[in-house]
Structures are given as structure tokens and as C-alpha cells.
Amino acid sequence: MKITELNYTLPTDLIAQKPLSERDKSRLLVLHKNTGEIEHRIFYEIVEYLNEGDILIINNTKVIPARLIAEKPSGGKIEILLIKEKKCSSQNVVWEVMTKGSYEGEVFIDEFIAELRNNCDGRYIVFKNMTSPKVRNLINEKGFMPLPPYIKRKPIQSDRQDYQTVYAKMNGSIAAPTAGLHFTKELLETIISKGVKLREITLHVGVGTFKPIKVDKLQEHKMDPEYFEIDKTLIEEIYAIKKAGKRIFSVGTTTTRALEGYASGKYEDRGSDNYKIKGSTDIFIYPEFSFKIVDALITNFHLPKSTPLAMVYAFCEMQKVKKAYREAIEKGYRFFSYGDAMLII
């Protein structure tokens, strides 16, 4: 499949720059994958599509305020996006980072001294004379939420709440699992009261999710691995539920990557125990992939030429998805992280 199939034209005024004041009042495009039928609903009406005995699986990862503003000795500012902690010692803590430019040398973050370095496998910041907990405190106090570049404004204090799901609890992501942003606690309670089983997994969203595809053939794209955890009892429950004819609703492409990465054996074990599967997956889901767990997908509208859009094409016939996107654009849906949602069922 050629990368051009993932391209489409989006008016810039449809890129949501801020969230709605009420999470569950966003619009919901329902796409029936067998027939191609499209419905236009409000997100809180999603409860009508869930039946007693179905499982709704959410990603409980929490976004860290991973964007830091540092100062060079010259007084110039440099913006740093923290990717993940690589190692720490009694004196130094090292994080993988992304920045504009290739500056190497000392930087100052508040009263703390750090050093930016390049090597053959990436770009790093070394926090000197600091422990890992102290660095994490610095991030929480001085960091900004890592809003995507298509949001053309500076992060504000309210983004710390808005760019976070109401059920986020496991620190580790540098981007939100955006499909989950539409749920309120009240909506989840309503869903549970209907007899739907709410279950959690963790997948820490990293560069792998939003890294652009730069090859012409999708098959040649390589995903960066992302860490996940799944309770072993959930896997048993999933297979029992599916055998009973009930459905698995996955909230977002990140939840889906964890579930299908595990089910496909496309993961590297990271210390699984008697209770949890712990691993990292670099699975890339694109058309012709055979889904083993997920029956219904809740997701946002994705960027052109992106890996999440490739997953959506894999989950539902490409031409049906393209038609749904065209209709969403015609009807003025809001796109991307703070935008509206789709249910593919």
C-alpha cells in the first residue's frame, strides 16, 4: 500500500485548538464497518451502542508535562521534549529528548544545570547531581503539557486537566490517548450501570504513535516500541467474553496497539509476572492486518499520512473510512487531539 492512500486535504479551521467545555458533548460519527452506514450523534450517546456483557477497555496512562524551556549560557531559549528516562546513577539522570536544532552543551532549567548531548543513537539531556525523583519533581513543577504542533498556541494551565483522561493514573506518556478525552466519570458510570464491564490496560504513548511515515510503502515503516501492561485475568476474560458472543470495545488506537500487539505475539517481554503481562510493542497495524481481539474501535480523526490512520484503514475498509472522513469534513467536524470522535462498529 502506498503512503499516498493515507493523504487527504483538511481545512485548517477544522483543526481543534482547544477542547469543548464539556467532554462528552463532542460529536460522534458512527461508522458501521459491514454496511458503510454513517450516523451522526453526540458522544454521550455512545452508551446506546454498548450492550450488557460487552467489555470497554481504556488506557489509563497519564501524560507527563514533558515540555521544558531551558536557557543556554548565551541567554537564548531552547524547548526540550522529554521522551523517556534512559538511565540514572547516584549523580546523573539521563533522558532521551527531542529539540529543534542540534545545540550541544550546558543548559539551565530554573536553578538546575543540565547538558544536551548528541550521539549515534539519539539526543539526550543529562541532569547533573540529581536523582530520578528530583528530576520528576522538576518536570511536574516546571514542565508544560506536550501539546501537538498543530495546536497553534502555547500550553496553558487548564491543559494539565484538559489534555488528560479522567481515569489517567499511570505516569509515562508524552501524548494523550485522545479517544479517551471524551469520557466523563458520569458517562462511565452510566455505561457500567448498563452491565458493560469497564477494564483498564496501560500503554505509555511515545514517539511511536505520532512519528510520521517517511517511506512510500507502508510495509517499510518501522514503529518505535511503546511499553504496555495488561492484567492476565483480563486476557482470560476477553477470550471468555468473545466465546460468549459479546464484544470488545477498544478506546483508542493506543489501547488497540497493546491488545493486538500482545495477541499477535508482536512484543518483547519486559518482566511479566504472575499477574501482569509487561512488554514493549513495535507493532504497526495497517491494511490486511487480522484483528484478534478488538471488535469495535472508538477513536478520533487522525492526521494524514499517520500510523493511527493506517490502523483505522485496517479496521474498516479504506473506502468506507475515506467516505466517512469526507462527510465529517463537509459537516464541520473538529479534527485531531481536541476534536470529535468516531465509533467504528
From Swiss-Prot:
Q: Which GO terms describe its molecular function?
A: S-adenosylmethionine:tRNA ribosyltransferase-isomerase activity
Give an example GO cellular component term for this record.
cytoplasm
Pathway listed for it is: tRNA modification; tRNA-queuosine biosynthesis
Reactions performed catalytically: 7-aminomethyl-7-carbaguanosine(34) in tRNA + S-adenosyl-L-methionine = epoxyqueuosine(34) in tRNA + adenine + L-methionine + 2 H(+)
Write the Enzyme Commission number(s) for this entry.
2.4.99.17
* Group of enzyme by EC: transferase
The places in or outside the cell where this protein is found are: Cytoplasm
Which SUPFAM superfamilies does the record match to this protein? QueA-like (SSF111337)
Could you say which protein family the record assigns here? Belongs to the QueA family.
Query: What is this protein's function?
Result: Transfers and isomerizes the ribose moiety from AdoMet to the 7-aminomethyl group of 7-deazaguanine (preQ1-tRNA) to give epoxyqueuosine (oQ-tRNA).
User: Oligomeric state and partners?
Assistant: Monomer.
Protein name listed in UniProt: S-adenosylmethionine:tRNA ribosyltransferase-isomerase
